[in-house]
Amino acid sequence: MSTTPATPKVGFVSLGCPKALVDSERILTQLRMEGYEVVPTYEDADVVVVNTCGFIDSAKAESLEVIGEAIKENGKVIVTGCMGVEEGSIRDVHPSVLSVTGPQQYEQVVNAVHEVVPPRQDHNPLIDLVPPQGVKLTPRHYAYLKISEGCNHSCSFCIIPSMRGKLVSRPVGEVLSEAERLVKAGVKEILVISQDTSAYGVDVKYKTDFWNGRPVKTRMLELCEALSSLGAWVRLHYVYPYPNVDDVIPLMAAGKILPYLDIPFQHASPKVLKSMKRPAFEDRTLARIKNWREQCPELVIRSTFIVGFPGETEEDFQYLLDWLTEAQLDRVGCFQYSPVEGAPANDLGLEEVPDDVKQERWDRFMAHQQAISSARLQLRIGKEIEVLIDEVEEQGSVGRSFFDAPEIDGSVFIDGDHGLKPGDKVRCRVVDADEYDMWAEPV
């Protein structure tokens, strides 16, 4: 008597940034198309895939810890992602891993899964359909849209180019077709991501591609114009402060894409920026920020900074605080510098900043910026905003405005039962705010 073969089961752990999350979605989509079931526990899986992060040492430590946990609970573990480029470092700690691959090596990961637990030969893809937009690890109403891989910069604190390579832009027609599928599937917000969004198309000399029969240049401006036609919120992340950023501000002012720019400035001191191998035109950047806000008064600017970089003096740090006062950024994150193995910053010969000084500067930075962020949000009280609902709780709903990217920014809280559900958009009036969040009521 014949029996139906068991459905192969895969456990999956995705660590790191949204770019890695998109890689995980791509791998999972392929496995689902081949009939694999993705399970939430180690013990139910035939094999576990861990997509690692290797950006900083603490991320590597977390990756190694998760790999060890998966080995302990399951025993059959495949490793991929950014830390995968350091196979020796992984096998030194966990010699029993079955396979190690770097980022973007989707086919190799799927093949490694095949070797452990082959797909069912009788799988009928018409029975177990994968949605056209693929498997998504985000809530249904928003999705990350990765437009390129790699980076052409050589920031001294970063090892991304050594892990993900030089800039490779996806064909704009392919990107727009994916965005179109996402919107048709119910996505209300598209978060454009890459290592360097403003450099999109540089590697292909902004070549013309086609989308729905019409020509579109492989360039950030034309991409944003086309995305704006889909009717979803469009939010730009990881924008390098190139002059061509000026070109998208009119689209924001016209309401075509969200008036939100995620630009990692990293520092303001010309000396520190030079050591970081970042653009050291902080005064010019302030002038550009002023110009952007004159064109688009609603513009929200998010950024990230590093304190305690080798050679940073108290004078450099005070310069940064003064720059923040001038810039009046809305959303800001800050990291204490942590040496990364293989980063050029390790060989600059600059004096290390003691850990206690790093902590003290981080505390001062956060207090300084919190006051700025709070003052800027206070200006929203009494004004109307559109809110995208993320979740509904017993006491009310939690959502986000154009001010807020998921995971990294604040929230908008709406008290009471208003019949809302995740993915709804609702017009609200802001009634209160602190340094991160807003409270609002429907109008």
From Swiss-Prot:
Subcellular location: Cytoplasm
Binding positions ([4Fe-4S] cluster 2): C151, C155, C158
Classification via Pfam families: Radical_SAM (PF04055), TRAM_2 (PF18693), UPF0004 (PF00919)
Cofactors that this protein relies on: [4Fe-4S] cluster
Class of the enzyme per the UniProt entry, highest EC level: transferase
Entry EC number(s): 2.8.4.4
All copies of domain MTTase N-terminal, residue ranges: 8-118
One of the GO BP terms on file: tRNA modification
Tagged with keyword Iron: yes
Listed GO MF terms: 4 iron, 4 sulfur cluster binding; aspartic acid methylthiotransferase activity; metal ion binding; protein methylthiotransferase activity
Keywords: 4Fe-4S, Cytoplasm, Iron, Iron-sulfur, Metal-binding, S-adenosyl-L-methionine, Transferase
Residues in TRAM domain copies: 378-443
Binding site for [4Fe-4S] cluster 1: C17, C53, C82
Domain of life: Bacteria
Keyword Cell division: no
Cofactor detail note: Binds 2 [4Fe-4S] clusters. One cluster is coordinated with 3 cysteines and an exchangeable S-adenosyl-L-methionine.
CDD domains: Radical_SAM
An annotated GO cellular component: cytosol
UniProt catalytic activity: L-aspartate(89)-[ribosomal protein uS12]-hydrogen + (sulfur carrier)-SH + AH2 + 2 S-adenosyl-L-methionine = 3-methylsulfanyl-L-aspartate(89)-[ribosomal protein uS12]-hydrogen + (sulfur carrier)-H + 5'-deoxyadenosine + L-methionine + A + S-adenosyl-L-homocysteine + 2 H(+)
Protein function: Catalyzes the methylthiolation of an aspartic acid residue of ribosomal protein uS12.
Family assignment from sequence similarity: Belongs to the methylthiotransferase family. RimO subfamily.
Protein name from the UniProt record: Ribosomal protein uS12 methylthiotransferase RimO
Classification of source organism: Bacteria, Pseudomonadati, Pseudomonadota, Gammaproteobacteria, Pseudomonadales
